[in-house]
Amino acid sequence: MFGNKNNKKSGMNIIIVGCGKVGSALVERLAGEGHNITLIDKDAAKIQAVTNMYDVMGLVGNGGSYGVQVEAGIDTADLFIAVTDSDELNLLCCTVAKREGKCVTIARVHTPEYSKEAGFLKEKLGLEMIINPEYEAAKVMSRTLSLPMAEEVSSFAHGQVEMIKIRIPEGNTLDGMKIKDLGRDVTTNVVICAVEREGEVFIPSGMFILRAGDLISFVATRKDARGFLKKIGLKTGQIRDALIVGGGKDAYYLAEQLIRAGIEVSIIERNADKCEALSIMLPKAVIINDDGTNEEVLKEAGLHNIQAFIPLTGIDEENIILSLYAKRMSEAKVITRVSRNNFKSIVNTMDLGSVIFPKYVISDAIVAYVRARMNSMDCNIETLYHIFGSRAEAIEFMVENESAVTGKKLSDMKFKNNLRIAYIRRKNNIIFPGGDDEIHVGDSVMVVTTNTGFQDIQDILA
């Protein structure tokens, strides 16, 4: 065993199998939430590196072994998460944990064949969740490509509301505008809930003055969001075609979603066997068996005229260089997939288009689930996103019972600083609240804040 046993009485007992990119991201997020974590992996060096960095226990061994799970404390575990690179091992781990413990189980399953059978696997193996980082990352990329001028598009309220991140261009209508004047000069159906300026994140008040170069996150319905973008002079049309470099699982999931949206897709992959498999799974895509890191190959594939470029080679350095090249040689919307944290500080200073960290897409979903199990029965967390490099959170709460926040005018309640209620969803209606609005039982409420660790809607109160 590596690490020191540190029982945090308020936290859950969590076992994580797999110390790769996803497992490490889960440790990073969940350790910061105050849980008791035991990490299992066959690689002693990986275990030691993580236990040196975080206050967690580490165990070297096979997570599918009953004996190893017993040593890890399966009898007292509340949650068991298997996120190795092997779908079969993850399912075996969860099966053993479910039979021998009383914990909730979550498995990573990323193979397309298994992913299509997720409902069957959950039911028959008693899994609480099946997670697929590649598929979820593809959904994020697909949403972002639906609005090419956006740096990020997130979905809330079962698709009724979007949170969209854009950078204010020089000379734009918003440059120099106070947020309180937005309704008078542009629209009333948009809430600007977070702003990043010169590396600092703000939850803006009505008196906050927007500036060119600001990164803003705003919330609106899909229709109103596009209307707002048109009014401020930004294009909202869908891309026509996309070029993907790399033929892995994430490329398959992304191409499948783009083709379904009517977008022409080309994939460059150097491995002939992968090309053959992709041509069968994606008959409407153009599959090119060549080296996508070769400048001439990219030119022949039409990089100069393509509308979207997404490098998914599996190697961060290649993806970054390809994105920089595409930004220089084309007008394409560029999305850069980054797997590791090593480059995070550098990546944030580079013009790489929209940057996606797949491991954090999944870890946000699991953190939301864990917080929902930890909180009171008065509400549940439905959706959680870390935004602006985890310096702020966007949380969607479902209010299930009367509490200190229900039945009162918002203007009569005192909220924590750096917090904004972005919307209230009541039945199928979206309300962008003012001071006279109230929160009712049955509502979904979205909160954006630079405070961290909210588990319950009542945490918004000062």
Mark where each language-model region is.
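Cytosolic regulatory regions of ion transport systems
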Residues: M1-A462
